[in-house]
């Protein structure tokens, strides 16, 4: 089941906002009924406190077409637009699905998101569990436990999210994603 639609008159793309105005741009597009997605991730601050932060600061996924360009030009908080061709945005939709799954998984655990320069050729693909279909690599953490780091490539920037070995091998049915 896909959470993001592929439109016939719009294509999904990425928008870079100025400063930290992605929340404003999200509400601006929502007001004009332009589909957009602003991913959040849960971050544990202390033992009893956690907050939801924007996963990719200054970036926002938006589906726009020719009819929406005039509306976008009126928003002064947009610095760049990166759009794919209409009906050729499967790669972006696939990335958004992975990001959505990670966003849902962050509600049950604290998974650090870091920028990296990982080598994409050495990645393995998981075939079962809650991270099924995601690509990454195994590493040994400082406390001696194995972690699986999921690698995401968003506009040429590589991100890694670390998951514990026990989480990777959990049954898929136990986690509703």
Question: Where do the protein language model's features map onto the residues?
Answer:
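Short coil-to-beta-strand transition motifs
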Residues: 126-135
């Amino acid at each position: 089941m896909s959470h993001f639609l592929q439109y016939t008159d719009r294509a999904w793309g990425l928008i870079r906002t100025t400063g930290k105005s992605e929340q404003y741009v999200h509400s601006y597009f929502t007001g004009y009924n332009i589909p957009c997605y602003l991913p959040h991730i849960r971050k544990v601050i202390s033992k009893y406190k956690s907050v939801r932060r924007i996963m990719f600061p200054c970036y926002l996924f938006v589906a726009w077409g020719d009819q929406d360009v005039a509306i976008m030009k009126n928003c002064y908080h947009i610095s760049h637009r990166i759009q794919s061709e209409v009906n050729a945005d499967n790669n972006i939709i696939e990335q958004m699905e992975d990001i959505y799954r990670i966003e849902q998984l962050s509600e049950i655990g604290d998974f650090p998101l870091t920028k990296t320069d990982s080598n994409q050729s050495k990645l393995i693909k998981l075939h079962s569990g809650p991270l099924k279909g995601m690509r990454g690599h195994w590493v040994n953490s400082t406390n001696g436990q194995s972690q699986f780091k999921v690698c995401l490539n968003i506009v040429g920037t590589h991100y890694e999210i670390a998951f514990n070995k026990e989480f990777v091998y959990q049954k898929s049915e136990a986690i509703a994603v």
